[in-house]
Amino acid sequence: MIVLGLTGSIGMGKSTAARMFRAMGVPVHDADATVHDLLVHDRQVHSDISARFPGTVNGNLVDRQALGVAVFGDPAARRDLEAILHPRVRQAAKRFLRKHRVLGTPLVVLD
């Protein structure tokens, strides 16, 4: 299986390239979508974020704007948020790759 990774800065066309691969039927793992899903559905993520960034989780909803204010511009806070999210994103990517290896998918994209 060929694993193609899309990398680059903001505005470099990664999302456009991912859409093109999807249109050709190539499975694409979208790390941004995984983060969004974690922020919406993962209760442990909610708990971890609430503990580290008080006032950013209301009930079962992460206030993304409040979290952004707490994190961006503060490198240590950003690293703390990444420490909560990145291991889970890596696990999701590993599950995606395992699934497609079993299926015999010839090409997948990690975005």
What do these predicted regions represent?
Residues M1:
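Short coil/loop residues immediately preceding or within conserved phosphate-binding loops
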Residues L4-L6:
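Hydrophobic anchor at the beta1->P-loop junction of P-loop NTPases
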Residues I10:
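The conserved Walker
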Residues S15:
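Walker A/P-loop
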Residues R22-A31, R43-Q44:
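Post-Walker A helix-loop "phosphate-sensing" segment adjacent to the P-loop in P-loop NTPases
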Residues V109-D111:
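Structural recognition of the conserved hydrophobic beta-strand(s) that form the central parallel beta-sheet
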